Regions:
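Hydrophobic alpha-helical transmembrane segments
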Residues: 20-25, 72-77, 99-103, 141-146, ...
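Membrane-interfacial amphipathic/re-entrant helices at transmembrane-helix boundaries
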Residues: 1-28
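Cytosolic-side transmembrane-helix boundaries in multi-pass membrane proteins
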Residues: 251-289
Length: 289
């Protein structure tokens, strides 16, 4: 019974194995980025940039249909363009960067939906907005795995300045010039992983496997390395459980994955050993034995 419910879907169906491999790749690449977004108080920036890739992906769709490379290139170009434009607006006007990103996010979402609607059907629009990880083909899986690998390599190179910048950015500027290049590389990784998530979960849910696991990890560890490990594990568990839930109940796979992650987040808020609500209400219970 347990085998049929939890394991058989992946041994019997190739599309489930592809989806699971994609979830693992997204977890390895996206969850560490989510931890740094949270530590740098940029979680909403990640959400805004997730929606900002929509017009580029929509233009790729308009020109080539549901073509992997056209939509990937369009999403990357749009994501980088919005990040750069938001920074320019924030530095040359009185509008702060979060407000300028929010403006571009709203415009991008409206523009992207309009572009997709010009050529596509409601089914195409739903595919772009919410993705379909169960329809993953080998090419898309390879792109996701490649981007995750690049993310881990670059993150290993810029890990030290990123950590220092999270703790003391003034000190980093004093002792090193690596702060600005590391920040730019980090923004590039954010865009790359949002495009990765877009292929599997769509633009509206792409940021989910980045931010929710990071939030979960924050309630279980104070150490950055520990938070990254917990975030990756919780993202993987959410993906696996969400796929099983989707397969057994026929609910959409993307929302199922995010809802499982949300359930883990609520559990962590209540019972996490770092500032969880239950621990705050009963601070001495852990000393009893």
């Amino acid at each position: 019974m347990i085998y049929d419910a939890l394991i058989a879907p992946f041994t019997e169906f190739e599309f489930m194995r592809r989806a699971l491999a994609a979830v693992i790749a997204l977890s390895l690449g996206g969850a560490p980025i989510g931890v740094f977004l949270m530590l740098r108080r940029m979680s909403l920036v990640g959400d805004a940039m997730a929606h900002a890739i929509l017009p580029g992906a929509a233009i790729g769709f308009l020109l080539s249909g549901l073509n992997l490379f056209a939509m990937t290139a369009g999403g990357l170009i749009a994501g980088f363009a919005v990040a750069i434009l938001a920074g320019v607006v924030a530095r040359t006007t009185e509008l702060k960067e979060d407000a300028s990103l929010a403006t571009f996010y709203l415009v991008s979402l409206a523009l992207g939906v309009t572009i997709v609607s010009i050529k596509g059907t409601n089914i195409d629009l739903l595919h772009v907005l919410f993705g379909n990880i169960l329809a993953m083909d080998d090419q898309t899986l390879l792109v996701i795995a490649f981007n995750a690998t690049i993310t881990l390599i670059v993150l290993a190179v810029i890990f030290r300045p990123l950590v220092i910048e999270c703790v003391d950015p003034v000190f980093l500027r004093t002792v090193s010039r690596a702060g600005a290049p590391a920040h730019l590389a980090f923004l590039a990784l954010v865009v790359i992983n949002l495009v990765n998530g877009f292929h599997a979960l769509g633009t509206l849910l792409a940021v989910g496997l980045m931010i929710l696991p990071a939030g979960i990890a924050r309630f279980w560890s104070r150490d950055i390395t520990g938070m990254i490990c917990i975030a990756v594990a919780s993202a993987g568990v959410s993906g696996y459980a969400g796929l099983v839930l989707s397969f057994q109940t026929r609910v959409p796979s993307g929302p199922a994955i995010i809802l499982v992650a949300a359930a883990l987040y609520v559990f962590s808020v209540l019972f996490g050993n770092v500032s969880g609500l239950v621990r705050q209400m009963f601070p001495g219970r852990h000393l009893e034995a």
